[in-house]
Amino acid sequence: FTVAGLKQLAASERFDPRTGNAVFPGRFPVGRSPFQVPTLEEELQLVQGLNKSRGRDAGVYPEIKEPVWHRKQGQDISRIVLDVLARYGYRTKADKVYVQCFDFEEVKRIRGELGYQGRLVQLLADGPQFESATDHAFLRTRAGLGEIAKVADGIGPPLGLVVTGKTGGALQVTDLVRDAHALGLQVHPYTFRADALPAWAGSFDELLRAFLVEVGVDGIF
């Protein structure tokens, strides 16, 4: 693919390709406006421009997607992303940036071979990932978290790996956050959606309160 080719595509909220119906019908209408697919550089320009005009200091949190697949296409996606971030001043832990990735070998490479000095998050999955040999079941263990702590600053688990439900009104919480915090890792669970709540949460406020107050995670996605 080329940037010019991708720019011909229209970006929209998620929809079911079989029916054309929006997956989340309460969000921005599908097909209402012909938004283009932005590049990472354009997104960084937007964030920094809005920071200037609004007097804010919002950071960025990009994800390295499928590094193994990209290498098979002859592209080092991690090096490319880190180079773009560096051009815009995102280099160290003093800068407002987190880089995240599901592939543990790539997370280690980002910190070691590529020499990235900023904040780094190992994403966790509750199932296999496309073209990744990462053993996510192991990474969720204390031993696995210990390996993560050698190279990363935090973990990003799905909600269900932190809270499994409620029994008699009490949250059923796994040991993941406790174990991660004991190793100095931050925990940023994903994905918080007001229109796709876990079965145990009666409202978005309840979901936020459970994770931020009762469980004590460090951030949300």
Give short role names for the model-derived ranges.
Residues 1-139, 143-144, 150-153, 157-162, ...:
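Metal-dependent phosphodiesterase/phospholipase catalytic core, i.e.
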Residues 162-217, 221:
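C-terminal soluble interaction/assembly domains
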Residues 148-150, 213-214:
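Flexible, charged surface loops at secondary-structure boundaries
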